[in-house]
Amino acid sequence: MKGRKIFRAVAVSLVLMVLFACCGCSGLRQERYSSSFFDTFDTLVTVYGYAKDATEFNEYMGIAHSRFIELHELFDIYNNYEGVNNIKTINDNAGVEPVKVSREIIDLLLEAKRLYAETGGKVNVAMGSVLSIWHDYRESGLAEPELAELPPYDMLEQAGLHTDLDQVIIDEQTGTVYIEDALLRLDVGAIAKGYACQLVKQELVEAGFESFVISAGGNVCTSGEPAEEGQTSWLIGIQNPDTQAAAEIVDTIEVRDKSVVTVGGYQRYYTVNGERYHHIIDGDTLMPANYYESVTVIADDSGVADFLSTTLFLMPLDEGKALAGEMGVDAMWIFKDGTFDNTDGYRQYSAYYMASS
């Protein structure tokens, strides 16, 4: 419950027992492999998994990497790619014409609209006009810290007039997306990476890969159970949002066929006059949310977990707990003072509570 300190919690070695276990344990038919790449979604993506040999694992990695590249290009809001209509293409044609897009983009936007409606509208993928202002000021502030400044609030307010998700018209029959408001911009950063992880997981399972973890920044997506004797769950460490603390991990959770997503203001920010301003912007205030240091969500679906982690970060604890219950997910909130709170269901996954019971 809130008020209890968590930094006594869990040794890093507990995480390493599974995530860095030796390959080819005696008597097992499968060995553990891992591989990473850093060319998609602006983050390091690592796949840990069990396969009969390196050739088989590399085949699965080829599927994962190529699919992540494809989804990265489709969901990108900053860059054009030859022969690809992506989110940027939709934005560039706002108020001009509908854009023919892939099924993946259609489904992503439909899911974002569904979750927006079901969760009170705290996370809005039509807020790109506001988020782009914060992005530009943050990038400038990081490049020249001595000149860092906040965006003028009247600029944010003007951009905030162009965030109506109903202005994003999705036509499934024609496979097009059209933004009616010429000044509205899409930004799918609150769901795209988790959604991509879920798609890649499903396609790897369909290809025959059964026991693996995809780790993409704060998104961890698990499939099956570790092919290690005596192991029935994956052990996932939750990062300490206090990056100066001695303990890098504040809790370890045991999950199987679940996704774990953590968001926090410590991950991407810049400093103005000694104050940190992170990238998670509240659509009501047009300013960074200030309730928590981080929020972790455990859910069946990685895209849902991604979206809900940001949603819960943007609302008070009582509202967040109620929403988590309605959505059938579990969560843990870490506050500015290092205390924490969680849903009751979170305890079944937590090494902290297991050690305390």
Task: Name each region found by the language model.
Residues 2-357:
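Mature catalytic core of soluble alpha/beta enzymes
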